[in-house]
């Protein structure tokens, strides 16, 4: 589905729909506040975004799983299986299942690591752990309230950003930006070439403005904005010194080398993380 043009600008139509977006956003905030998520024994890494549509989540999830395997772990993917008829939990078998069964992206994920399709995310995560997963990588699901996450990465299109800044149906956002980013430990800005750096600078300024003092994402935005824009790209790509993020469920044993490799190897992406700058 093609996104409406008014999602990219604050047109009269978008402004007219804005009250509905506020109601939608408040509903999303209430759901998160009332959530009592289920925790599995393996760490859960969620690759999500704040807007509808693709923003590089699946390639990012693939990169994370590839690096986890390189570190000797047994990652399994977990996804809802949009576009497929199977509710799951079911382990995707590319030799048996089709896109009509599980959707397109699970077939792509299953070529790299075991992939589970489950509309019931806790049940899918439990199935993955029972099948030998020592870490679960969720492709999408940042707004899902039923499964506890140990690490959340928000993938943002560095050029499109958050569109007109309105929540559905007035804009592309699934929830208020500040609400979503308060639950993440890193922002992955996926962009093309150097032309996206100005958009990245705008994103950093937005992050700095919406977060309270002491928030880790605000801290890194503050630090990066002290650099010249030409330096930002180089500094993010060469970010070393990444430390554990204080996650639960044993994730702290996985995440430091994961983030180090993530910064070095994720092609075309810029990782904004508070430990990236000493």
Which stretches of residues belong to each language-model region?
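Walker A (P-loop) phosphate-binding motif
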Residues: 32-97
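Intrinsically disordered, low-complexity segments enriched in glycine and mixed charged residues
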Residues: 196-278
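Phosphate/Mg2+-binding loops and adjacent switch elements
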Residues: 81-83, 87-194
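A broad detector of short, well-ordered amphipathic alpha-helices
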Residues: 21, 59, 63, 123-126
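A transmembrane-helix-recognition feature enriched in membrane-embedded lipid enzymes
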Residues: 1-44
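P-loop NTP-binding module
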Residues: 17-21, 33, 43-49, 53, ...
């Amino acid at each position: 589905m093609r996104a409406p043009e008014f999602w990219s600008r604050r047109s009269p139509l978008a402004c007219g729909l804005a009250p509905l977006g506020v109601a939608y956003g408040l509903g999303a905030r209430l759901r998160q506040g009332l959530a009592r998520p289920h925790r599995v024994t393996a760490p859960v890494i969620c690759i999500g975004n704040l807007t509808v549509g693709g923003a590089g989540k699946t390639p990012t999830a693939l990169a994370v799983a590839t690096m986890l395997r390189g570190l000797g772990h047994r990652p399994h993917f977990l996804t809802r299986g949009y576009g497929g008829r199977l509710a799951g939990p079911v382990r995707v078998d590319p030799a048996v299942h089709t896109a009509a069964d599980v959707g397109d992206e699970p077939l792509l994920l299953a070529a790299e690591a075991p992939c589970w399709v489950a509309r019931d995310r806790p049940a899918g995560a439990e199935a993955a752990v029972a099948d030998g997963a020592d870490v679960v990588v969720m492709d999408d699901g940042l707004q899902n309230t039923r499964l506890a996450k140990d690490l959340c990465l928000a993938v943002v299109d560095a050029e499109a950003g958050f569109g007109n800044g309105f929540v559905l149906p007035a804009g592309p956002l699934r929830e208020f930006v500040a609400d979503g980013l308060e639950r993440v430990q890193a922002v992955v800005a996926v962009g093309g070439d150097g032309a996206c750096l100005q958009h990245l600078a705008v994103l950093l300024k937005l992050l700095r403005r919406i977060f309270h003092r002491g928030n880790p994402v605000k801290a890194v935005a503050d630090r990066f904005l002290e650099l010249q824009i030409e330096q930002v790209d180089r500094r993010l790509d060469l970010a070393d010194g990444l430390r554990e993020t204080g996650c639960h469920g044993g994730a702290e044993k996985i995440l430091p080398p994961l983030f180090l490799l993530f910064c070095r190897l994720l092609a075309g992406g810029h990782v904004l993380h508070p430990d990236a700058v000493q």
